[in-house]
């Protein structure tokens, strides 16, 4: 079973957002350090920090364009001497919107900015499509507070894997 804990902070201005995600995977059987939550040493941490820049186009053509680069953590070369700066580029478009229900489809590809001696990146064994998404969201309202709940399927054609995810946004400051 895959398990992770995410902290993030984001800033938004008009159609742009800038975010920093701190992702810590504590899945059983991981091949990296997943037993020291507060370890932030580049050579031995089980986490990674992801810097993300998004642009949401205007409402007439509501396309989300995203660029995400892992700037720290377990995105290292084989010798563990350099960060690979794996980068994920993504497009997402709403395919259905009605009242409190939304459905979105997306596609993303990955590559490493620093090859560091190999063709691999954090998301796959080579450059290419690593993310195909279909997501359904319901805007649940409780005491005048909206908390979006989503369910999504994600496919990684390069790795021949599929994932199911459930999530809720408890608050938005």
Model feature map: region roles:
Residues 1-92, 112-127, 159, 167:
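Outer-membrane pore/translocation modules
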Residues 134-136, 160-173:
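Outer-membrane beta-barrel "beta-signal"
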Residues 12-15, 19, 56-63, 93-105, ...:
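Short loop/turn motifs that connect adjacent beta-strands in outer-membrane beta-barrel proteins
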Residues 102-141, 148-152:
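Outer membrane beta-barrel transmembrane domains
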């Amino acid at each position: 079973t895959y398990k992770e804990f995410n902290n993030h902070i984001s800033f938004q201005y008009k159609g742009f957002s800038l975010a920093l995600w701190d992702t810590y995977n504590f899945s059983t059987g991981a091949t990296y350090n997943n037993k020291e939550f507060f370890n932030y040493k580049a050579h031995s941490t089980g986490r990674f920090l992801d810097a993300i820049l998004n642009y949401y186009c205007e409402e007439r053509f509501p396309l989300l364009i995203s660029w995400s680069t892992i700037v720290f953590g377990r995105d290292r070369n084989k010798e563990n001497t350099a960060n690979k700066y794996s980068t994920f580029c993504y497009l997402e478009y709403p395919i259905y919107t009605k009242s409190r229900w939304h459905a979105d489809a997306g596609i993303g590809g990955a590559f490493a900015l620093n090859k560091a001696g190999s063709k691999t990146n954090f998301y796959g064994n080579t450059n290419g499509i690593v993310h195909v998404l279909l997501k359904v969201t319901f805007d649940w309202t409780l005491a005048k507070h909206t908390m979006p709940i989503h369910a999504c399927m994600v496919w990684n054609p390069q790795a021949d894997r599929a994932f199911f995810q459930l999530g809720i946004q408890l608050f938005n400051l």
